[in-house]
Amino acid sequence: MSINATLLGQAISFLLFVWFCMKFVWPPLMNAIEERQKKIADGLADAGRAAKDLELAQVKATEQLKDAKATANEIIEQANKRKAQIVDEAKVEADTERAKIIAQGHAEIENERNRVKEDLRKQVAALAIAGAEKILERSIDEAAHSDIVNKLVAEL
């Protein structure tokens, strides 16, 4: 193998080509590759962050759902307590009203009883006076006197 000018020219041309590629072609290629690697790494990092954000959002949504259920249960419990309180108040009010009506009825009965007693006293007094008058008119006759008393007793 002989080294001639052609081989030497080809070697120099190859070295110039390598130098040119290293100087002008290789850096943009490396920059493009590095930029692509950076984009891929950023995309993977963003995907990881998105997955974490999704997980956090799911946890937060679960917590909010638990809080909402707890709040709903608390509201239902308060409503049930209020319902029981209203029912108890209505029972107490009804018992009070019933007692009031019963007391009013007893008072009316007592008033009617007193009125009837008073009427009866007046009638007894009138009968006693009438009997006394009749006895005085017939005071001589004992049999008539006893008959009048018996009639008074029967009328009472």
Swiss-Prot record:
<keyword id="KW-0812">Transmembrane</keyword>
<comment type="function">
    <text>Component of the F(0) channel, it forms part of the peripheral stalk, linking F(1) to F(0).</text>
</comment>
<comment type="similarity">
    <text>Belongs to the ATPase B chain family.</text>
</comment>
<keyword id="KW-0472">Membrane</keyword>
<keyword id="KW-1003">Cell membrane</keyword>
<feature type="transmembrane region" description="Helical">
    <location>
        <begin position="7"/>
        <end position="29"/>
    </location>
</feature>
<comment type="subunit">
    <text>F-type ATPases have 2 components, F(1) - the catalytic core - and F(0) - the membrane proton channel. F(1) has five subunits: alpha(3), beta(3), gamma(1), delta(1), epsilon(1). F(0) has three main subunits: a(1), b(2) and c(10-14). The alpha and beta chains form an alternating ring which encloses part of the gamma chain. F(1) is attached to F(0) by a central stalk formed by the gamma and epsilon chains, while a peripheral stalk is formed by the delta and b chains.</text>
</comment>
<dbReference type="InterPro" id="IPR050059">
    <property type="entry name" value="ATP_synthase_B_chain"/>
</dbReference>
<keyword id="KW-0138">CF(0)</keyword>
<keyword id="KW-1133">Transmembrane helix</keyword>
<dbReference type="InterPro" id="IPR002146">
    <property type="entry name" value="ATP_synth_b/b'su_bac/chlpt"/>
</dbReference>
<comment type="function">
    <text>F(1)F(0) ATP synthase produces ATP from ADP in the presence of a proton or sodium gradient. F-type ATPases consist of two structural domains, F(1) containing the extramembraneous catalytic core and F(0) containing the membrane proton channel, linked together by a central stalk and a peripheral stalk. During catalysis, ATP synthesis in the catalytic domain of F(1) is coupled via a rotary mechanism of the central stalk subunits to proton translocation.</text>
</comment>
<keyword id="KW-0997">Cell inner membrane</keyword>
<dbReference type="InterPro" id="IPR028987">
    <property type="entry name" value="ATP_synth_B-like_membr_sf"/>
</dbReference>
<keyword id="KW-0066">ATP synthesis</keyword>
<dbReference type="Pfam" id="PF00430">
    <property type="entry name" value="ATP-synt_B"/>
</dbReference>
<dbReference type="GO" id="GO:0046961">
    <property type="term" value="F:proton-transporting ATPase activity, rotational mechanism"/>
</dbReference>
<keyword id="KW-0406">Ion transport</keyword>
<dbReference type="GO" id="GO:0045259">
    <property type="term" value="C:proton-transporting ATP synthase complex"/>
</dbReference>
<dbReference type="GO" id="GO:0005886">
    <property type="term" value="C:plasma membrane"/>
</dbReference>
<keyword id="KW-0375">Hydrogen ion transport</keyword>
<dbReference type="GO" id="GO:0046933">
    <property type="term" value="F:proton-transporting ATP synthase activity, rotational mechanism"/>
</dbReference>
<keyword id="KW-0813">Transport</keyword>
<dbReference type="InterPro" id="IPR005864">
    <property type="entry name" value="ATP_synth_F0_bsu_bac"/>
</dbReference>
<protein>
    <recommendedName>
        <fullName>ATP synthase subunit b</fullName>
    </recommendedName>
</protein>
